[in-house]
């Protein structure tokens, strides 16, 4: 049962809810998100004295609607919760009460907050969740959380967090260093939530709109082996971008991930041999997720260390080169026609700015009719099988709509944020830094390509271009 309380600090009042089974440390991390006062500097006064980190909140006599006093000064974050290296850009970003709702950090929960904001960037998925009928479980709590985020005020996702930890206990892991909850891997949170939604939504929305298909061929590398190549079909919810010492572009990393060397037993040779497994996409979904494989297990430190290499990613992705020849043949005519339409649109826009003369109504009507004809031609080129495949991308072209970034040196430390494109203004992106929401220009997103411990892209969300 959640208990509503208020906290007074430096003349300001903060309303929040607490869970009796949580500790004083959890409350202090909530207050840090609201006030920027680091937990170790906070003095929260309760009945009997100062609130201790390891004490259960339900044991100190906090009553509903009680007002507690907090003392402490805001300052730099402690080393256990490092500030991203690019935090100085904050002053260049504007703020407005009309921005989307942020999520309060409940103690190393930025991995969850950024994942929720990324999922929320898919409005059709939110619509599918709103139709979920069950009254219990993680999806029901996610539905409630989405409803509470309709306003612009920051939201405390406590009930959703509790449900997440109940269904996936790994997210309840405690940190040996701080004694509070440990930082978690946002990619694991993303994958887990998607798999839960995939199983739970009766409309099969995730399967239709976010799941792609792979056709893989495995062949022995040794020439003397007369083995027939084996063919397999797999489904994927995320496309890995492998990062080697030679990877400079996301498309390179994806292609590297689609080609693997595998050692396995050969029945013909009666021993282990090297095989090449080459995969190509046989179905492209409406929403394509790309995961930068930036973390690897480093035994010397006992953690997932981070690959800091700079890897450029595109705002517009042409996925045709990742596809099977059969699918590519279906996509290319539509892709080329759509690009032609977009090029014409850009030329008309530049010409209008150059001459600075408003076209007449007749000219506007003629231009609109011409564009409708081009769109109709493009739609007529869509392969019938792709047209009947609900949730499939018939063009192979995508726009970048979301980035989940990580700042820090390992998956179990640092800070996660979400960057979501403004659907009303392509030149602007919303930056979700837990409860703090601000606007950044599209140029800022280009700097998330890595090269150090500052914010670097970890999960990218692409949306299929519309033929319209």
Swiss-Prot record:
SMART domains: UBQ. The gene is ubp6. The active site is at 110 (nucleophile), 415 (proton acceptor). This is Ubiquitin carboxyl-terminal hydrolase 6. PROSITE patterns: UBIQUITIN_1, UBIQUITIN_2, USP_1, USP_2, USP_3. InterPro entries: Papain-like_cys_pep_sf (IPR038765), Peptidase_C19_UCH (IPR001394), Ubiquitin-like_dom (IPR000626), Ubiquitin-like_domsf (IPR029071), Ubiquitin_CS (IPR019954), UBP14-like (IPR044635), USP_CS (IPR018200), USP_dom (IPR028889). Its main location: nucleus. One of its GO terms (biological process) is proteasome-mediated ubiquitin-dependent protein catabolic process.
